[in-house]
């Protein structure tokens, strides 16, 4: 028996975030960082970032490079990236990318 069409659903947010994942991953690798996904992608895209090579850029520069993927070749002065601290010394950058779609990038170090 075929599935009822109403039973087949797609999380549109997950599909939206999945479409940009490879660009984010490659950007992080170019900056000397490794990234991994965490969470359901139901509301935002939670990314765990860790410096992977000795020459990795700072966390702030990684975030700026990722923002360039959505904002062209330069960071807009009014682009709102908010930084915060979480438990166990974790730092997080929240990047609004469109409407209520966000990237939350977390790291245990700022790699200065």
State the predicted function of each range.
Residues 1-43, 50-112:
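Catalytic core of pol beta-like nucleotidyltransferases
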């Amino acid at each position: 028996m075929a599935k009822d069409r109403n039973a087949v659903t797609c999380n549109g947010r997950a599909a939206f975030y999945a479409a940009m994942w490879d660009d984010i991953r490659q950007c992080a690798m170019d900056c000397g960082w490794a990234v991994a996904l965490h969470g359901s992608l139901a509301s935002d895209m939670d990314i765990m970032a860790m410096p992977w090579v000795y020459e990795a850029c700072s966390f702030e520069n990684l975030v700026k490079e990722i923002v360039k993927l959505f904002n062209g070749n330069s960071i807009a002065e009014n682009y709102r990236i908010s930084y915060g601290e979480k438990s166990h010394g974790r730092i997080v950058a929240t990047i609004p990318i469109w409407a209520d779609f966000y990237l939350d990038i977390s790291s245990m170090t700022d790699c200065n």
